[in-house]
């Protein structure tokens, strides 16, 4: 058999023909997940995961949203999870944004009159913000959990940023260091789950990817004044990956009239996988906020 006729396989060597997937504009195969309600969905919501992880880590959130009669859909971004691409490498951050819009358009064709929402965590929060900014009146609302708005000041000092930009020209694949999983959550069992997840990339942040994250922060800063959609913003005060000051900046800079910030004192980065009292509160806040916005979108009036 010629090699060209061999089925495309995931990085884990599973044929894509056996899995839900889409093919992006670059011809790369992206693994998809769908959580569909039993009846006709009242709304659609795309879930955008963070750097180094995959959309399967949002199963609990997705099932909760599915219980609201939402069709929840997601994919592993290029270079992540079961999608193609060198691990945690992307030619341009816009690729992530473009792929989300492609997936959104594909699903929307089947449900043309159903309101659509975005949910994003960390890097996925930055992606969601940029997606929403590209289509200012398209989405009915957005949920952001610890979004990447400002980089951590410890890792993104002026000197370190300059050094990274210089290194990107000569050693783009040099590893800057791994994500310290202990700063993700105060819940040790959740940290252990992260550390043992075979689909999580723990190879370390390459210079070229770090530069794309810095580019994303700059783009988010420019995009914030264009945001007019309703959004819920959940942030931990002790987040050492995405500076909590970014949450206040987003609240101040966006033009949205319907915007809510809930700050969790002492909480770390992954609020939906934090100590039980935090995670339960996050699920409750998301459930309540989304329920009200679905009703408002269906009635064609503000909440």
From Swiss-Prot:
Q: Identify which top EC class this enzyme belongs to.
A: hydrolase
Cellular localization per UniProt: Cytoplasm, Cytosol; Membrane
Keywords from the UniProt entry: Cytoplasm, Fatty acid biosynthesis, Fatty acid metabolism, Hydrolase, Lipid biosynthesis, Lipid degradation, Lipid metabolism, Membrane, Nitration, Phosphoprotein, Serine esterase
Task: Indicate how the chain sits in the lipid bilayer.
Answer: Peripheral membrane protein
Q: Spell out which residues are annotated as carrying Phosphothreonine.
A: 10
* Modified residues annotated as Phosphoserine in this record: 189
The active site is formed by 122, 239, 269
User: What does the annotation give as the result of altering residue 292 to A?
Assistant: Slightly reduces activity
Lipid metabolism found in the keyword field = yes
Gene3D superfamilies this protein is in? alpha/beta hydrolase
Name one cellular component (GO) term.
cerebellar climbing fiber to Purkinje cell synapse
For whether the record's keyword set contains Membrane, the answer is yes
Report, from the record, the phenotype seen after gene disruption: Mice display a reduction in monoglyceride hydrolase activity and a concomitant increase in monoglyceride levels in adipose tissue, brain, and liver. Ten-fold increase in brain 2-arachidonoylglycerol levels, combined with low levels of brain arachidonic acid.
Pathway field of the UniProt record reads: Glycerolipid metabolism; triacylglycerol degradation
Task: Supply any other comment.
Answer: Short-term inhibition causes analgesia, while long-term inhibition causes tolerance to endocannabinoids acting on brain cannabinoid receptor CNR1, and a reduction in brain cannabinoid receptor CNR1 activity.
Q: How does it assemble?
A: Homodimer.
* Family statement drawn from the similarity comment of this UniProt entry: Belongs to the AB hydrolase superfamily. Monoacylglycerol lipase family.
Q: What does this protein do?
A: Converts monoacylglycerides to free fatty acids and glycerol. Hydrolyzes the endocannabinoid 2-arachidonoylglycerol, and thereby contributes to the regulation of endocannabinoid signaling, nociperception and perception of pain. Regulates the levels of fatty acids that serve as signaling molecules and promote cancer cell migration, invasion and tumor growth.
**What name does the UniProt record give this protein?**
Monoglyceride lipase
Q: Which organism is it from?
A: Mus musculus (Mouse)
């Amino acid at each position: 058999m010629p090699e060209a006729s061999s089925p495309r396989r995931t990085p884990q060597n599973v044929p894509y023909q056996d899995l839900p997937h889409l093919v992006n504009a670059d011809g790369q195969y992206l693994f998809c997940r769908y959580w569909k309600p039993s009846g006709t969905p009242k709304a659609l919501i795309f879930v955008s995961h963070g750097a180094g992880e995959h959309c399967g880590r949002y199963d609990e959130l997705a099932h909760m949203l599915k219980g609201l009669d939402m069709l929840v859909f997601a994919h592993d971004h290029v270079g992540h999870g079961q999608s193609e691409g060198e691990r945690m490498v992307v030619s341009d951050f816009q690729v992530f944004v473009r792929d989300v819009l492609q997936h959104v358009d594909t699903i929307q064709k089947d449900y043309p009159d159903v309101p659509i929402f975005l949910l994003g965590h960390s890097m996925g929060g930055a992606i969601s913000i940029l997606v929403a900014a590209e289509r200012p009146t398209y989405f009915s609302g957005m949920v952001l959990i610890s979004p990447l708005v400002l980089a951590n000041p410890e890792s993104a000092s002026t000197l370190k940023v300059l050094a990274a930009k210089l290194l990107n020209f000569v050693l783009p694949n040099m590893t800057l260091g791994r994500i310290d999983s202990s700063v993700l959550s105060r819940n040790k069992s959740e940290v252990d789950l992260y550390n043992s997840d075979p689909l999580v990339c723990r190879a370390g942040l390459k210079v070229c990817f770090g530069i794309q994250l810095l580019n994303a922060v700059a783009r988010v800063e420019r995009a914030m004044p264009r945001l007019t959609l309703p959004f819920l913003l959940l942030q931990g005060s002790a987040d050492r990956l995405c500076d909590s000051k970014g949450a206040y900046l987003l609240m101040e800079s966006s033009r949205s009239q319907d915007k809510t910030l809930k700050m969790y004192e002492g909480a770390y980065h992954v609020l939906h996988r934090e100590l039980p009292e935090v995670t339960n509160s996050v699920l409750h806040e998301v459930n309540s906020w989304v329920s009200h916005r679905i009703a408002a979108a269906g009635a064609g009036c503000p909440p």
